[in-house]
Swiss-Prot record:
It catalyses: acetone + hydrogencarbonate + 2 ATP + 3 H2O = acetoacetate + 2 AMP + 4 phosphate + 4 H(+). InterPro entries: Hydantoinase_B. Its cofactor is Fe cation; Mg(2+); Zn(2+). Belongs to the oxoprolinase family. One of its GO terms (biological process) is cellular detoxification of acetone. This is Acetone carboxylase alpha subunit. The keyword Transport does not apply. Its EC number is 6.4.1.6. The N-terminus is blocked. One of its GO terms (molecular function) is acetone carboxylase activity. It comes from the Bacteria.
Length: 776
């Protein structure tokens, strides 16, 4: 197929803005029809430019890729928000005229797909005619109903023209501190519908002639709590987009529009072929099944929501069936996933499908050629009505990541089993950490301004272990592989919270032959804040990142907060006060130092806004990654080294690893080799003594299933999954040999089921045409 339009087909037609004269919709529809008919992007049977002029092709790639990375690094310095400047929470992507990405920068590359989804929505809904798409226009979007991850990711999108015709788009995204939601911070928890998610912008034209509209500036700054950060982050995005637009214009002027035009489409097909080749090289054909869970503990008194029907504990369910074929194609099917819920953890299909490439670029496709080709090379099935493909326009998305990171960790385990089978041991990953806790809140800050905070220290969690080495400690997040915990001094400038400690969170990484990387923890004291609130957000009752091949899960979360601490007087008197970290939460030391304080120490790791005053304490605990392999196979000296380094608590050396350690005169722990050998032999004997045949275990479990002997949350989860996933229910029945008379309707469980029978999709709104990206 020739991606350049045949001029003869346009005779008598209204001329569109795309190069060659097509309208945006005509252009995209033609490309998608050719893609569907041939299985190749845009019907490209050969990559003409790449094959005939490989030096020019690679020159274009190298120059443009370097340019988008340079734009990110330069724009990052404009940002005032530490989320952007410290953590690098931004990304720039270059798109062809059809809205498909051909190149992206480093950073939060999940937005390769989300900004593209916004462009495709504009194309599908004829933005070309109204409000119009012109050279030097500026568009803004954060609408999660059309593909964004959550409202705090703000897109700036700029069209690129050459000689009066549109040849592409460039998008920039930053994660902002506040979106004007019900609660302060970028990812509030108090709302249960999207109407409380904050400022919502649907591909709005906010500027022309490279100038933002005054009405937009006046409106947007008053819609959020953090006006200064909002305005400077917008300038960050615009600056990067304009740098990339200028680069494209220079490249076209030097290399010719024909070369650039071919590259803009061949690069996508190149990306698809690259993924297919890597799948063939690194995996084993077959069907892989795995599952992920995470808790939504909303029945607790410290979760205050406006609707009674949302006041219940539920569990997210994400079973994944991965099918790898001999030709290098593959299919990811999430049949059996639970329904969307009345909370802020739902996700759009694009955030689910686009986000997986953040991890894939670390293992499966470790290439700078990150674009929509990989998406075109993957078959996704996300059933309509599930939490990752909701069928109701009321759903909230504020913290989609709570479910996303917990669901994806299962996918990495499936891929890792395949890598392991092919011998790519260094690419094995036991799973990602649950990227939390999220310290958020707001009020009047130390500068007497209305403010909100969203600490991004959790951009540095532990990573999962591989099959050859331990995971990295306090190093990265699944949504930003280049994440950074940030400087304490910068966070103290942005937040009225003084650091009393920051240290490695011992034993937060999962145990194993290779240990998961540990997270870390920061103890913050409220100082010089007024009318201040904060809340917690993360996993607590469920460990969402399991280990692999005998490795242990990472530790789940908990909360520690202290009110009415009397710290002012304790400090004045020189008494001992909490400092450093909460090293062993089962044997706490801080609580005794604060005898009169109101302390909250429990597994309720999700709360809504809670009032805090000066001298109150808040522990921000970042999670670790899961482990790989049996802990009894770990080198004993590595366990001693972990204790000495603060990565493992001494009591777990014997309990988990079977390693006997002795403390030397120098205060360092060493290994008792003979004692260790005996301890490990005994643990193995104990395991055998406790074990039962699988058939016997299954018999007992089947009896529990027949009696419906499970917690309310578990029964509700499976009931919702059965209703949305009939094939999942059939497989479940077959596996457990259940009679036809056994049923599990939600109605018999005795919990509210609002949304399970009645829903209204966004596509039912007047003049709205959605874009479908997955099989539903």
């Amino acid at each position: 197929m020739n991606v350049t339009v045949d001029q003869s087909t346009l005779a008598g037609a209204t001329r569109g803005i795309v190069r060659g004269g097509e309208t945006l919709k005509e252009h995209r529809d033609r490309l998608m029809a050719a893609t569907k008919a041939t299985g190749r992007y845009a019907g490209l049977k050969t990559l003409e430019l790449r094959e005939r002029e490989p030096i020019l092709y690679n020159k274009l790639f190298s120059r443009l890729r370097a340019g988008v990375v340079d734009a990110r690094e330069t724009a990052k310095k404009i940002a005032a928000s530490p989320i952007v400047e410290q953590e690098g929470e931004l990304c720039f992507t270059l798109y062809n005229a059809a809205g498909d990405s051909l190149l992206t920068s480093t950073g939060i590359i999940i937005h390769v797909g989300t900004m593209g989804a916004a462009i495709k929505y504009m194309i599908e809904n004829n933005w070309e005619a109204n409000p119009g798409v012109h050279d030097k226009d500026i568009f803004c979007n954060n609408d999660s109903l059309i593909g964004n991850v959550h409202p705090c990711d703000i897109h700036t999108i700029v069209p690129i023209f050459w000689e009066g015709e549109l040849i592409g788009w460039v998008g920039g995204v930053t994660h902002v501190i506040d979106t004007g939601a019900v609660g302060p911070g970028s990812m509030a928890t108090g709302q249960v519908q999207r109407f409380g998610d904050g400022y919502s912008i649907t591909c709005r034209k906010v500027g022309a002639n490279d100038t933002l509209f005054r009405d937009w500036l006046h409106e947007s700054q008053r819609m959020v709590r953090t006006t200064r950060y909002w305005m400077l982050d917008e300038r960050t995005r615009i600056a990067g987009c304009h740098m990339i637009r200028k680069l494209v214009e220079e490249v076209v002027a030097e290399e010719g529009i024909e070369a650039y035009w071919k590259f803009a489409y061949e690069a996508v097909e190149h990306g698809r072929l690259g993924l297919q080749a890597r799948i063939k090289a690194m995996t084993i054909p077959g069907t892989y099944r795995q599952v992920g869970f995470v808790d939504v503990p909303y029945a607790h008194e410290d979760v205050r929501v406006p609707s009674d029907f949302a006041k219940l504990d539920t569990i997210m369910h994400a079973p994944c069936e991965m099918t790898i074929r001999r030709d290098g194609t593959w299919r990811l099917d999430f049949e059996g996933s639970s329904r969307w819920g009345w909370h802020t953890y739902n996700a759009h299909q694009v955030s689910f499908t686009s986000g997986i490439w953040v991890m894939m670029t670390q293992t499966l496709i470790p290439s700078e050629m990150i674009n929509d080709g990989a998406a075109y090379g993957t078959e996704f099935r996300l059933p309509k009505g599930t939490w990752m493909n909701p069928d109701d326009r009321r759903v909230a998305f504020s913290y989609s990541w709570h479910f996303l990171v917990s669901a994806w960790t299962a996918l990495w385990r499936g891929l890792s089993r395949s890598y392991f089978g092919r011998g790519y041991l260094e690419e094995v990953n036991a799973g990602n950490a649950n990227t939390s806790n999220w310290l958020q809140g707001g009020g009047f800050n130390q500068y007497d301004e209305i403010h909100a905070v969203n600490s991004f220290e959790c951009a540095a969690n532990g990573t999962g272990a591989t099959a050859v080495q331990d995971g990295l400690s306090h190093a990265a997040a699944i949504w930003n592989p280049e994440g950074d915990m940030g400087d304490m001094e910068i966070w103290e400038l942005a937040e009225p919270l003084v650091y009393l400690g920051r240290q490695i969170k011992a034993s937060s990484g999962g145990s194993g032959k290779y240990r998961g990387g540990c997270g870390f923890e920061s103890l913050r004291m409220v100082w010089n804040a007024k009318d201040w609130t904060m809340f917690f957000m993360g996993n607590g009752h469920i460990s969402s990142d399991w280990g692999l091949m005998g490795g242990y899960p990472a530790a789940s979360g908990y909360r520690f907060a202290a009110h009415k601490t009397n710290l002012k007087e304790l400090i004045a008197s020189g008494a001992e006060i909490p400092l450093g970290g909460d090293t062993d939460p089962e044997n706490p030391t801080w609580d005794a130092m604060l005898p009169d304080a109101q302390i909250k120490r429990d597994k309720q790791a999700i709360t809504t806004e809670e009032m805090f005053s000066d001298y109150d304490l808040y522990l921000n605990y970042m999670r670790g990654g899961p482990g790989f392999g049996d802990p009894l196979d770990r080198e004993p000296q590595a366990v001693a080294d972990d204790i000495n380094g603060g990565y493992v608590l001494e009591r777990f050396a014997g309990e988990v690893y079977g390693v006997v350690v002795r403390k030397g005169a120098d205060g360092q722990y060493g290994v008792d080799e003979a004692g260790t050998a005996a301890a490990r032999a005994q643990i193995r004997k104990d395991r055998l003594a406790k074990s039962v045949p699988v058939s016997e275990w299954m018999k007992g479990e089947r009896e529990k299933i027949l009696a419906k002997d499970a917690g309310t949350q578990v029964r509700q989860m499976f009931a919702a999954s059965f209703k949305l996933g009939p094939r999942f229910e059939k497989d479940f029945r077959t596996f457990w040999s259940l009679p036809d008379s056994w049923t599990l309707p939600e109605e018999e469980i005795g919990v509210p089921t609002y949304g399970s029978r009645y829903s209204m999709d966004i596509s039912e709104l007047p003049d709205v045409h959605t874009v479908q990206f997955v099989e539903e």
